[in-house]
């Protein structure tokens, strides 16, 4: 949500659509159906019950439906590109260190080294995902956040080994 607002302030786009799509994009987690599909259905029904403009509801539903298709080269609206980039940015940076550290802490054999390897693996998996960013502003921020992780890993290596 916060990344969507930050990107919108740089790039423009309909703030109402961006905010509502960002807040509701993951509402449809489901084990049997793609969560974009489920989420779009839930969001459309909910927003309709609130009396939101039907044209905005349609755009929000479309964004939620396809937000997880990060590898698509489809002709996406600015609002959709912003929500997709915000979704990627929400997963990387300092917050990922916290998530990995907390996940490691609840393991049976928690240690600093296990947290280090988990964070390093996260970095390795997520660094190439910069190519999934749909806006230049998203790519720039993603790059900064990955640099933060790289610097953190470098410092942690100096302290652990």
Regions found by a protein language model. Give the residues of each.
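Alpha-helical phosphate/pyrophosphate-handling elements in metalloenzyme active cores
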Residues: 1-18, 30, 42-51
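Divalent metal-dependent phosphate-bond-processing catalytic cores, especially two-metal-ion Mg2+/Mn2+ enzymes
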Residues: 2-12, 24, 52, 72-161
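Helix-adjacent hinge/juxtasegments
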Residues: 37-80
